[in-house]
Amino acid sequence: MEVRDKLKDNQGIIMATGSTEQHGPIGLIGTDTICSETIASSVAKKANMYLAPSIGFTPAEFNMKFQGTISISAQTFKSLLKEVTSSLLKHGFKYVLIVNGHGANIDPIKDVMIDFNNKLFFKSWWDFPTVNDIRNKEFGDLEGMHATPSE
């Protein structure tokens, strides 16, 4: 199906943001992106929306001492997010919904949202009540948010 055909049926597009950073000996370097992509993909399927390619290179300077981490500045991330969002809106999507997977992305995303007058929205994957219910049921007090089995 062509993008123009999908735009006839739906107005928005979903995009995941994550990070490329360490997650200890049990986690993958791309865990933040994998988690947000998984949830974004499920939402896109249920809502019959397109899923844009994910943004996995984001601010993670605090983890640069761990080999494998790739960090970009918050300003570079904001510029990238602005240009990607502008492109999607220019092509006819009415809004962009971000499913975020990295805490350091929150403030830059909020900063960029201001420029888009209610056409850019976000929710971090850990803010979905169903996700929290599953995490609490499966891991209880062992839930630690970062580099833990629930992630």
Language-model features, listed with the residues they occupy:
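Active-site and ligand/interface coordination hotspots across diverse enzymes
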Residues: M1-G27
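Alpha-helix C-terminal capping segments
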Residues: L7, V43-A44, M113-N117
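Active-site histidine-anchored catalytic micro-motif
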Residues: F57-S150
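Short, charged beta->alpha transition segments
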Residues: V3, I39-A40, L81-S86
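Glycine-rich loop at the start of a catalytic domain that most often binds anionic cofactors/ligands
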Residues: I26-T33, K65-G68
